[in-house]
Amino acid sequence: MSKTAKSVKAICRKYDKFLCVESPDSNALLFPSIAVSSFRKPDIEQALEKLLEITNNDELAISRQLAKGQSTNPRYYLCYCDYEIDFLANGQRAIWLTQQEMAYHKWIPEDQKMADLVMSPLFEKSPYTTKTAVQLRANDAVGRTLEEIDFNNTEKQGNKSYPGNVIEHVWFDHPADNISAPDFPEAEVELKVSPIDIKKSKDGPSCIAGERLVLNTINYAKESTADFRTSSFWKKNRFIELMQYLRRIASEKGQSEDKRKYKIKYAHLLAMDDFAEPNFPQNSLLSLSEATMLRIEQDWNTIHQFIVENRADELTEGMTDTLAACTKGANNKQKSKQSNGARAKSRAYCFKQSFMTSLLQNYASDVHETTSLIKDIKQLQNRSCDSIILDYFNPFKGKSFTEIAEQFHFTIPKNISPKQTNFMLVDHMLGSNTSISKDPNDDYVSFDAEELKGIRVKTLPLFHGKPSEQFKVQSIPDFNDLINQKWDTDNCALHQLLETTKFLVFVFDNQNPNEKDKNPENIYFKGAAFWYMPASDIDIAEQVWKEDVE
């Protein structure tokens, strides 16, 4: 092998056994290896999967790099297999040995040091092998600031991942890795650290999620052959240790702050599946309802359909409600291969910010009940959430304002605006069991129903079938702020809104002789529809935005 040749070796683990092979030149053992074109993460993953004959339906959990060799540049990677393979791709017989059994064998000189490390009784002995152990450790962090946890200042405060690094590297003493299995494989628990912001309003302060919860990166080629229960999303995130810290007053975003003062406020196990650990602290458990799980699975199916059809370049966060596919990378420009070889923007699964806020408010506020528009959750087994909600409005299509008001036995007040009239009627169609929140800039309203969290509700007025006003999505911010924004970053408010937002649009047609005439007898409800901006239209909006900024 030339000096420039590169190779990787697999320290492959299945429970208490490790994968070894016999050297063709002697009776000594070695760790299986394969040549790689580069030490880039995708090349390493592809090579190890080929070596260990991992198919698209089987997830090889590749953990951290353990060591680097000298002459031939082998790099050792800890891997976790779903099952014990019998043969490698090159035909070599697989030998599975415990640490004690490994000690009775001779090893090739190149692998002797690594074998000694693996045979050590302390090798990869995590104290967090159960969900209970992870949770108890997480609970001990509640009430502490990041400064109190990382009192030696080992983590860089300027790093965007500083809070997560402090919890993972310092508090849990967990090494940095990019593993496709959960962070604590034996416990099947993924660790996530997420901010809480305080939102002030006339009704008093309330806690909101500071951002979406970004989960694992989507491998389009692999995910195209999976179903929900075999997907990387399910394997990685079935159980999430969610640790949340108080960050800031939401309106103070952008001001200088000392991240070391962030304080851990909550620690919960977000469980999407059942588990049996009788000593687990039940007050730390967040179990998702059947309805929520069905909505998450529907969202996954929506994303999956685009992946299967090699249309990942058309994905946006706005097309789903709870689980979404968000852009991945510092400038949102990274590309990943689809199953047909075409490249699309790299994306990761994420829980939307509105869903995270809804979860948070279940235990951070005194109000624990949320209105649901879906009365029979069995409907979600064969119908989309959107279609069920639209059923509330379909019976009123084609009816005038007066007819709708008469059906609900009320009279439309004469001293309210047309927009107020519109939403009053919408509220009655929904059964008058939701509350309406109005945007300060009058851009949209939102309903507090569980299924409409995070959805912007807009009206589209027509005059004899033609739009009578523009579809306003956002007020123009301060111009000095605008010129400092960059489209492909999180600080571009318009891009974030178009990429992440789903709208519920109500169409009303004014059939009066004069557009200013608001006689309710001649204004008709034409219907409702959910809408998000397609990726192709977002690209057009980008060009217009850049021209305006320049």
Question: At which residue positions do the language-model features occur?
Answer:
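Active-site segment of metal-dependent pyrophosphate-handling enzymes
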Residues: 5-6, 45, 49-85
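Anionic group-transfer/hydrolysis microenvironments
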Residues: 11, 24, 100, 192-194, ...
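Conserved Nudix-box catalytic region and its N-terminal flanking loop in Nudix hydrolases
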Residues: 13-55
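Conserved N-terminal beta-strand and adjoining loop/helix that marks the start
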Residues: 1-19, 37, 75
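Nucleic-acid endonuclease domains
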Residues: 93-94, 121-185, 190-550
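A generic fold-level signal
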Residues: 3-5, 13, 71-72, 89-91, ...
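Short, charged/polar surface micro-motifs in flexible loops or helix N-caps
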Residues: 15-18, 26-27, 81-85, 195-197, ...
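Nudix hydrolase/Nudix homology domain
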Residues: 26-29, 76-78, 86-126
